[in-house]
């Protein structure tokens, strides 16, 4: 499989390779929100947490959606992706129709008044981050693949199947990878 680092940019998906054994990233699907010469930042899409936004984030008492573990960095910070950049100041478009961040007070108002629906947003605790050169080195070691992101993937609740489906969608030899057992040695 080829090194896909050159394809990486904001709005792409990072897929943990089948041989990624680090528990924080094993079989994860991440969306890249920032990628430049200083490093990269992404959020894990398929690690929902057991508690809800309303239980952990002040100002969002009406939001019954689950929080997601965005990554192992700064796990005391809250981040969000959404589809309403037209309504939330300070949003950064990472791919057409998908935005990162923005004014949390505006977001709270829009959600609490029903102008914006919880299905249009995903909340994360923490993020995945890499310093300059770190992610490139991990690509060279075969730790990651890339894939195209879409609104359907980013807001999907099919957490258990997300990694396999996304890897499989790359076609070819990736279909075999997607069907491999998590612990081949135990097979």
From Swiss-Prot:
One of its GO terms (cellular component) is cytosol. This is UPF0301 protein Ppha_2142. SUPFAM superfamilies: VC0467-like. PANTHER family: UNCHARACTERIZED PROTEIN YQGE, UPF0301 PROTEIN YQGE. It comes from Pelodictyon phaeoclathratiforme (strain DSM 5477 / BU-1). It comes from the Bacteria. Belongs to the UPF0301 (AlgH) family.
